């Protein structure tokens, strides 16, 4: 009985490690697919892209025309 429980626990841990590695690789692929970024006053969409470059953030004051604005060092 203990052997079966030990085997199940080990199998679960191995599966968990494999799954974690798969998710991490998937995130790396996703980051690579994001592509380039857009600069100030260019149209953006945080949820689907294009994304704002570093130093800018996407604001949707006039939805659906969201634009990148300078974060002024915030």
From Swiss-Prot:
The record comments on the domains as follows: The presence of a 'disulfide through disulfide knot' structurally defines this protein as a knottin.
Pro-sequence residue ranges: 21-34
Tissue specificity, in the record's words, reads: Expressed by the venom gland.
SUPFAM superfamilies found in the cross-reference section:
omega toxin-like
Please name the GO terms that the record assigns under molecular function.
sodium channel regulator activity; toxin activity
Q: What is this protein called?
A: U3-agatoxin-Ao1g
- UniProt key word Disulfide bond: yes
Xref: PROSITE patterns:
MU_AGATOXIN
More about this protein: Negative results: does not affect mammalian sodium channels (Nav).
Role of this protein: Insecticidal neurotoxin that modulates the insect Nav channel (DmNaV1/tipE (para/tipE)) in a unique manner, with both the activation and inactivation processes being affected. The voltage dependence of activation is shifted toward more hyperpolarized potentials (analogous to site 4 toxins) and a non-inactivating persistent sodium current is induced (site 3-like action). Interestingly, both effects take place in a voltage-dependent manner, producing a bell-shaped curve between -80 and 0 mV.
Q: Where does the signal peptide begin and end?
A: 1-20
Q: Name one Pfam family in it.
A: Toxin_7
For the modification Asparagine amide, which residues carry it? 72
Family indicated by similarity: Belongs to the neurotoxin 07 (Beta/delta-agtx) family. 03 (aga-4) subfamily. Aga sub-subfamily.
Could you confirm whether the keyword Secreted appears in this record? yes
Chief place where the protein resides: secreted
User: Any S-S bridges, and between which cysteines?
Assistant: 37-53, 44-58, 52-68, 60-66
Where does the record say this protein resides?
Secreted
Q: Which UniProt keywords apply?
A: Amidation, Disulfide bond, Ion channel impairing toxin, Knottin, Neurotoxin, Secreted, Signal, Toxin, Voltage-gated sodium channel impairing toxin
Q: What cellular-component terms does GO give this entry?
A: extracellular region
Q: Which domain of life is it from?
A: Eukaryota
């Amino acid at each position: 009985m203990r052997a079966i429980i030990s085997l199940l626990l080990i199998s679960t841990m191995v599966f968990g490690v494999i799954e974690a590695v798969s998710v991490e690789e998937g995130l790396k692929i996703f980051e690579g697919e994001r592509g380039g970024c857009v600069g100030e006053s260019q149209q953006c969409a945080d949820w689907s892209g294009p994304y704002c470059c570093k130093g800018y953030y996407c604001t949707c004051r006039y939805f659906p025309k969201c634009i990148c604005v300078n974060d002024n060092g915030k």
